[in-house]
Amino acid sequence: MEVIGTVFSVLGNEMAVRFGRRRWILLVMCISIVCALGLGFVSGISYWATVTACLVYNAFIYADSASLTAGAVGSAEPERKGATMAMHALLGYSGGFVGPLTLGVMLDLMGGETVFSWGIGFAHVAIIMLVGPTALLILKPRDLEGDRGAR
């Protein structure tokens, strides 16, 4: 999964350069939300459907990673690039820590190992993920110089 993630991270940034960073990140975040909404419920179909859904979800989770990092660095004031990267890393790793915990809490609250529990658990993740596109739509960060799709 990490190899797929790394490849999609790099390819995702190339797409951001070609089509516009904000537009690409918004699209990928929305696809990730849709994937999260369905992922837990797919486990009731078959093992291979679940594996495929997990791989697709993983690819889209990573597809905006490099674009977000490049956007953070490219948008930072020159004298604050280090502090910006520190905050970027802190927020990213905090989400990576808190996300699985909240999913686990939701699983426990919903009764554990049922398809419904997993579906609600991942739906909860999707709801939290709405913060990303909402922030992009409200803050409207500029695309970076060199992004061909920039408006």
Segments predicted by a language model, with ranges:
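Intracellular helix-loop hinge segments at the cytoplasmic ends of transmembrane helices
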Residues: 67-75
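A membrane-interface helix-boundary motif in multi-pass transporters
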Residues: 105-128
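Helix-to-loop junctions at the C-terminal end of transmembrane segments
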Residues: 9-21, 107-108
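A late C-terminal transmembrane helix in Major Facilitator Superfamily
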Residues: 75-111
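Intrinsic disorder in cytosolic terminal tails and internal cytosolic loops
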Residues: 139-151
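C-terminal transmembrane helical hairpin of 12-TM major facilitator-type secondary transporters
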Residues: 20-68
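Residue-level signature of mid-helix packing/kink "hotspots" within the transmembrane helices
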Residues: 2-10, 96-97
